[in-house]
């Protein structure tokens, strides 16, 4: 009986995992095509140059605790709390640091031979806005670990599809209204916000 239940859970997990990955690929491609028709390469360049800083910051604030929590043999409520507050605290510090460094990042690209049609002075406010995603993502790190650990594949698929759809529609709408790279930046932040809100909704340890 227990073996059949395990097989059933595994089959459902594989099914929802496939649905989530397939939907993410299809929706990501479709929304990407729409955005590409509305935005210029320079728009993508304005946001793209900031991604390396976001990637590094996210790697530092996570520090492997998410997967360690997900793979630990036994996890207590206090363990989730500890990881949650560590990630939030780290993200807040990193955001404050990057907020301060934003003008220097702008100056670096202004001095380099960076071929882009936009006024690079706009990189400072754009960077400070994009870096907000570091903090919002940290608020859902422990919750993601909970969903991963408890094999809630269906919920993860729903979260991915919903977050991608909402954030992409926001980005496309803003791009259509003429906000150019701000639409792309808002899409990224909106995705992390939607993810985090839904992680909290489906996680019961809080």
What are these regions (language model features)?
Residues 66, 142-149, 153, 176-177, ...:
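C-terminal transmembrane helix end/exit motif
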Residues 6-65, 90-102, 110-111, 128, ...:
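Signature of the first transmembrane helix
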Residues 36-39, 70, 106, 148, ...:
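Helix-capping/transition residues at the boundaries of transmembrane alpha-helices
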Residues 38-41, 77, 120, 150, ...:
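Helix-loop interface residues and adjacent transmembrane-helix termini in multi-pass membrane transporters
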Residues 59-77, 148-149:
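Helix-loop junctions and terminal segments of transmembrane helices
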Residues 81-90, 140-164:
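Substrate-agnostic recognition of the 12-TM MFS/MFS-like secondary transporter fold
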Residues 66-67, 95-108, 138-148:
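Transmembrane alpha-helix boundary signature
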């Amino acid at each position: 009986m227990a073996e059949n239940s395990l097989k059933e859970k595994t089959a459902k997990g594989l099914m929802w995992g496939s649905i989530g990955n397939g939907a993410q690929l299809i929706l990501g491609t479709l929304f990407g095509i729409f955005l590409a028709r509305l935005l210029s390469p320079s728009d993508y360049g304005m946001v793209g140059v900031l991604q390396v800083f976001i990637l590094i910051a996210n790697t530092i604030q996570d520090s492997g605790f998410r997967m360690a929590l997900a793979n630990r043999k036994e996890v207590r409520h206090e363990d989730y709390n500890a990881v949650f507050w560590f990630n939030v605290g780290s993200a807040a510090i990193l955001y404050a640091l990057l907020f301060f460094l934003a003008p220097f990042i702008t100056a670096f690209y202004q001095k380099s031979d960076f071929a882009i049609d936009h006024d690079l002075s706009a990189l400072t406010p754009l960077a400070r806005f994009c870096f907000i995603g570091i903090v919002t993502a940290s608020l859902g790190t422990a919750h993601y670990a909970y969903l991963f650990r408890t094999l809630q594949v269906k919920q993860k698929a729903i979260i991915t599809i919903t977050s991608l759809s909402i954030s992409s529609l926001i980005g496309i709408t803003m791009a259509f209204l003429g906000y150019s790279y701000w639409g792309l930046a808002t899409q990224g932040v909106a995705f992390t916000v939607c993810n985090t809100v839904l992680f909290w909704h489906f996680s019961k340890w809080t």
